[in-house]
Every structure is written in structure tokens, then in C-alpha cells.
Amino acid sequence: MGKVTGISGRFGARYGSTLRKKWKEIMEKRYDEHQCPYCKTTGKVIRLASGIWYCKKCNSKWAGLAYTPY
């Protein structure tokens, strides 16, 4: 059975293991289900751009961190 690499498996053996692990942590946080700080709904928050987050349920838009909304 092969090793499970997750989202960073597309890089193969390139870029070094440390950078791939750091990138994997950041991307898993980015695509995780986030909670809206206004309506407290989970799973409806999307990233529009770097640092700009939007809730599909209450239509609120706010500035957060680059890869996480708060």
C-alpha cells in the first residue's frame, strides 16, 4: 500500500518535504468548512479573493486573513 500524501501529492518529489508539508497545512485550513462570524452558519463561507471572505447565507462580506477568515 502506498503512502497517502493528500492535497500536496500533485507536487511529487519536487520542492522539498518541508515546503510541501507547510503548503499542505495551509491549503487544508483554507478548504476546511468555516463558520460565519455574523450568522454562525458552518459550511457556507467561501473565499472571494486573498483575504476577502463571503457568506452565502447572510450575504455578508468581510476582510480576514489570507487563507482563513479569522
UniProtKB/Swiss-Prot annotation:
One of its GO terms (molecular function) is structural constituent of ribosome. Binds 1 zinc ion per subunit. Gene3D superfamilies: 2.20.25.30. A zinc finger (C4-type) spans 36-58. Keywords: Metal-binding, Ribonucleoprotein, Ribosomal protein, RNA-binding, rRNA-binding, Zinc, Zinc-finger. InterPro entries: Ribosomal_eL37/eL43, Ribosomal_eL43, Ribosomal_protein_eL43, Ribosomal_zn-bd. Transmembrane segments: none annotated. It comes from the Archaea. One of its GO terms (biological process) is translation. Its cofactor is Zn(2+). Coiled coil: none annotated. GO terms for cellular component: ribonucleoprotein complex; ribosome. The keyword Hydrolase does not apply. Zn(2+) binds at C36, C39, C55, C58. The keyword Magnesium does not apply. HAMAP family: Ribosomal_eL43. PANTHER family: 60S RIBOSOMAL PROTEIN L37A (PTHR48129), LARGE RIBOSOMAL SUBUNIT PROTEIN EL43 (PTHR48129:SF1). Binds to the 23S rRNA. Part of the 50S ribosomal subunit. Belongs to the eukaryotic ribosomal protein eL43 family. Putative zinc-binding subfamily. This is Large ribosomal subunit protein eL43. It comes from Saccharolobus solfataricus (strain ATCC 35092 / DSM 1617 / JCM 11322 / P2).
